[in-house]
From Swiss-Prot:
Belongs to the prokaryotic/mitochondrial release factor family. SMART domains: PCRF. It comes from Neisseria meningitidis serogroup C / serotype 2a (strain ATCC 700532 / DSM 15464 / FAM18). It is found in: Cytoplasm. This is Peptide chain release factor 2. The keyword Mitochondrion does not apply.
Length: 367
């Protein structure tokens, strides 16, 4: 075993120790450890299961806290253990054992990198589930097909992450794709990961719907907002709501047009409209629509609070509803994020849900 390799491995452990100390302070390790002990006590109380919703929230919080506290504990013990193992394997000239230490240290580095990535989730709702609204821009079939492609892209991304997806509303295009759709994404840090996808997405391609095979440009809007749990209070005055029911349309079977089960809720002070038609029950659709409304009102309030700050930050573009954030040029095999400059050539992989590079770049740059 070469001295340089041994020194490099020891330096890696020293670096991990420093990064671990920094992240313990940043993430308030002791506070999270104390809270985890409280949550474990709550989760072991038999009375908790009389309130399934509360039990689910406690379970979710426990999982998030354990992901931070136990990982930091494991890194700390791993650093000490591997320091001793380096000494032992060097003394005994155990090359196989030393290789095992190198592999274990690489695993610790991966755990640390994952934790450092989570540092970028700095909004209160980042750990939450989220909703994604996708709306086709002007342009008929071209735009509707593009919206359908984005719908598939985000669905595939969620599947890759092991997230659960639920289609709350889907209005099919006349020939292809969708006019609009809303999907719910359930998973740890779903909102934190997807929130920077809000904006206008631009597609340039040779159209499969044009007999002359001309190049077309299409637009679709994406709006991502968090699902709000009981830890964030949103007050809604019933007098501010207009609730309409209608017969659901689109895919769903023969039953779907027989009753006015679909629900549309308009929040008149803000003009926000939400709708849900995925359930046979009008009551269930109304409950789901109310959750969507709470989430949109929360997102609106957060955006108002950040508006002044965003306006003052040089070089940071507005990522609101009307801004173009990404360009997909298929015939040139190029997809570029206009905010971060991140660019890839494998368009097929991206449209199949490989969004990690774009998301990581946007979070690192604080988009």
């Amino acid at each position: 075993m070469e001295a340089e390799v041994i020194n490099q491995l020891n330096n890696t452990l020293n670096d991990l120790e420093k990064r671990s100390e920094d992240i313990r302070v940043y993430m308030d390790y002791q506070g999270k450890k104390d809270r985890l002990e409280e949550v474990i006590g709550l989760s072991e109380d038999p009375e908790l299961w009389n309130d399934p919703k509360r039990a689910q929230e406690i379970g979710k919080e426990r999982k998030i806290l354990e992901g931070i506290v136990l990982t930091l504990d494991n890194i700390a013990s791993g650093i000490e253990d591997n320091r001793m193992l380096i000494e032992m394997t060097v003394e005994e000239n155990d090359e196989e054992g030393f290789a095992a230490v190198q592999e274990d240290v690489a695993g610790l580095e991966k755990q640390m990198a994952d934790l450092e990535f989570k540092r970028m989730f700095n909004q209160p709702a980042d750990p939450n589930n989220c909703f994604i609204d996708i709306t086709a821009g002007a342009g008929g079939t071209e735009a509707e097909d593009w919206a359908g492609m984005l719908f598939r892209m985000y669905s595939r991304y969620a599947e890759r992450k092991g997230f659960k997806i639920e289609i709350l509303e889907e209005d099919d295009g006349e020939i292809a794709g969708i006019n609009r759709a809303t999907i719910r994404v359930e998973g740890e840090y779903a909102y934190g990961l997807l929130r920077t996808e809000t904006g206008v997405h631009r597609l340039v391609r040779y159209s499969p719907f044009d007999s002359n095979n001309k190049r077309h440009t299409s637009f679709a809007s994406v709006f991502v907002y968090p699902e709000i749990d009981d830890s964030i209070e949103i007050e809604i005055n019933p007098a501010d709501l207009r609730i309409d029911t209608y017969r659901a349309s689109g895919a769903g079977g023969q039953h779907i047009n027989k009753t006015d089960s679909a629900v549309r809720i308009t929040h008149e002070p803000t003009g926000i409209v939400v709708q849900c038609q995925n359930d046979r029950s009008q009551h269930a659709n109304k409950a789901a629509a109310m959750e969507m409304l709470k989430s949109k009102l929360y997102e609106l309030e957060m955006r108002k609070r950040n508006e002044e700050k965003q306006a003052l930050e040089e070089g940071k573009s507005d990522v609101g509803w009307g801004s173009q954030i990404r360009s997909y040029v298929l015939d040139s095999s190029r997809i570029k994020d206009l905010r971060t400059g991140y660019e890839v050539g494998n368009t097929k992989a991206v449209l199949d849900g490989d969004l990690d590079g774009f998301i990581e770049a946007s979070l690192k740059q604080g988009v």
